[in-house]
Amino acid sequence: MRSAKLLPFIVTVCAILVLGSGCSRAAEPASSTYTDLLALFADWRDFESPPLLDGAPDYTVAQFVARDDEFRALEKRLDAFEIDNWPIPEQVDWYLVRAEMNGYDFNQRILKPWARDPAFYKTVWTYRSDVPAHEGPTHHALVELWTYEFPLNAEAAERLTGELAIIPPLMTQARANLTGNARELWIAGIRDIRTQSADLAELKLAVGDSVSKSLLNAIDESIVATDELVVWLEGEAESRTGPSGIGKDNYTWYLQNVHMVPMTWEEEVT
């Protein structure tokens, strides 16, 4: 679940929280300004986008371990702000950054979609979501086919070729990363990855022979890599027998610290 997608859900509730409660934070850098927060936000967003591994976003355990100290340092920078006297809109922005960092922390500690949910690796999207980004966890290099106009011009064909290039290495990485035991997520995820293969086949028909050989090769290689992942997922399905839920306590933490909604699981369902 990309933390950038949290913004639309929490702007209103953050404003309510700020108006209704104090915002005291560690006072060491009392001179920290809103400009400093903007600089931190830029650093945070740079960090939140993972490095590449063989041309695809890196979701390996080693990557998260290697960068954890950097993440904790960003958290400390945010916690050090003294925002009590800031205008309310600027305080809200502080909470937005806090929520995004909490979302990242929750994903790497609890949700771990890159390890538990095969659908996380779905890359090709043929339709626009009815939410600002996409529902459910998605990775950082999606191919939004619905944004392209067909027939493709040369510039668009080149851009699509580059976007499709991440699919083979990402499908390979998925087989190493998917160590989770969430059965329902596993079974549903197979369907999503299989659908990607069908969407790529339709794309190949749509572009025909009028595009560059490099684009056709990128489509073919993406289909092969996607099909190989489907076969692997199906072979592993029988051994994935665990629950897919994260538990009430974790849900409550996510609700309160990421979406900034002051409710518990029990309050939501009653």
Show the residue positions of the predicted features:
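N-terminal maturation segment of proteins
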Residues: 23-270
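Bacterial N-terminal signal peptides
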Residues: 8-21
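N-terminal secretory signal peptides that target proteins for export/translocation
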Residues: 1-5
